Amino acid sequence: MENKPSVLTDKYDVGRLLGQGTFAKVYYGRSILTNQSVAIKMIDKEKVMKVGLIEQIKREISVMRIARHPNVVELYEVMATKTRIYFVMEYCKGGELFNKVAKGKLRDDVAWKYFYQLINAVDFCHSREVYHRDIKPENLLLDDNENLKVSDFGLSALADCKRQDGLLHTTCGTPAYVAPEVINRKGYDGTKADIWSCGVVLFVLLAGYLPFHDSNLMEMYRKIGKADFKAPSWFAPEVRRLLCKMLDPNPETRITIARIRESSWFRKGLHMKQKKMEKRVKEINSVEAGTAGTNENGAGPSENGAGPSENGDRVTEENHTDEPTNLNAFDLIALSAGFDLAGLFGDDNKRESRFTSQKPASVIISKLEEVAQRLKLSIRKREAGLFKLERLKEGRKGILSMDAEIFQVTPNFHLVEVKKSNGDTLEYQKLVAEDLRPALSDIVWVWQGEKDELTSQQETEYQQQQQQEQQEQEEPLKF
């Protein structure tokens, strides 16, 4: 590959070499506009075309665009010249996880953190039908905050790579981390193969060495095929049990990610993580309470009891009224499905749902609180007519949270918008479809998009309601 450019398309300064492979080199870069650090992967177009790998490059781009997750290296943009293809990616200052493990085994809590983040990333990719197929410490990077980032999707597979039997058939990956069914050149399930590799990574993090290793490659394959490994004496019993289930040579009986999350070792670490988070929240709240406890005149909290409730589920701000936002005709047009321009911008337009209701705002709020309690969601008021609902447990992409905002069209006619503010979009869609919609049915008049046109009965009801309210407004006051 020819010498690197010092500036890439007037957008990035290109700096030192970070690493290289057969067909590509990765350089440190910096955005000229924002000063943000990036990693720039330069691929020799001629080399990849000679060996027929251009489709693999295209697949890697597709996968990285699908797999947007906090624990997956983000692809910012792709550029190309006559001789090169450039991937501009998230820069991970901490380097490879391999470098940490090379110095020796990690503490249990540190190993748990990395394993937890790895499982979250892999689970998310699988939910998008993306299978990595080359999970190993060299492909797991660390950012500035020591958070894990899965990288190098060059060997990954999409669901459409499967044959008619529904299995993958390409042998790939690093031998010491590859599942037995992949080595045997049989069709394999990408999900199960990735779980095996995650099991090997977990062993390496806790032991500091590989579970399957031999100078003779065929002997190593034999050990992998029989799951012939010995756990060190310092491994806790619950870790041994989990590893035996992850490194099960039979893919049919190998543990699933859902069951990994339920394992005692995984839950124990999660419990410790939640305790730390709760402690941090209490510390933040105590600091905020100290600063908010006095006003400009040095007086304490007001006597009207307008502070947050003790249970923290419902927070009412002192300056906020209970009245929802009023909508005018232009607001309604902008919010209507027919005028929604979000689809033009290529984003997934499934992150929000709207419904209309003929119930008063107080009834809608009470119903939201009741449903939140039933679905084990926390709910708190942010401002007039706006509520934050959150799941108590982390999902594939962190805590799933959504905003429910009530808009007043008339005193007895409201529009409610439920919008995802954090977490996985697929989890949000499932929650809305399977839980929220049925639970809210008795206050919903119609969901947006459910019917393109209102039924004649609904139209008549709405017109009558509008006429009645107009008459009430026009009727002169009598003293």
Curated annotation (Swiss-Prot):
Residues 286-323, 456-479 are annotated as: Disordered. It holds the Pfam family Pkinase. Residues 12-266 form the Protein kinase domain. ATP binds at L18, G19, Q20, G21, T22, F23, A24, K25, V26, K41. Residues 311-323 have a biased composition (Basic and acidic residues). Residues 288-300, 457-470 have a biased composition (Low complexity). Residues 322-346 form the NAF domain. The modification Phosphothreonine is found at T170. The keyword Cell membrane does not apply. The modification Phosphoserine is found at S156. The keyword Disulfide bond does not apply. InterPro entries: Kinase-like_dom_sf, NAF/FISL_domain, NAF_dom, Prot_kinase_dom, Protein_kinase_ATP_BS, Ser/Thr_kinase_AS. Keywords: ATP-binding, Kinase, Manganese, Nucleotide-binding, Phosphoprotein, Serine/threonine-protein kinase, Transferase. Mostly expressed in roots. GO terms for biological process: signal transduction. It catalyses: L-seryl-[protein] + ATP = O-phospho-L-seryl-[protein] + ADP + H(+); L-threonyl-[protein] + ATP = O-phospho-L-threonyl-[protein] + ADP + H(+). Residues 152-181 are annotated as: Activation loop. Residues 350-379 are annotated as: PPI. Its cofactor is Mn(2+). Interacts with CBL4/SOS3. CIPK serine-threonine protein kinases interact with CBL proteins. Binding of a CBL protein to the regulatory NAF domain of CIPK protein lead to the activation of the kinase in a calcium-dependent manner. Belongs to the protein kinase superfamily. CAMK Ser/Thr protein kinase family. SNF1 subfamily. The activation loop within the kinase domain is the target of phosphorylation/activation by upstream protein kinases. The PPI motif mediates the interaction with the ABI (abscisic acid-insensitive) phosphatases. PANTHER family: CALCIUM/CALMODULIN-DEPENDENT PROTEIN KINASE KINASE-RELATED, CBL-INTERACTING SERINE_THREONINE-PROTEIN KINASE 10. This is CBL-interacting serine/threonine-protein kinase 10. It comes from Arabidopsis thaliana (Mouse-ear cress).
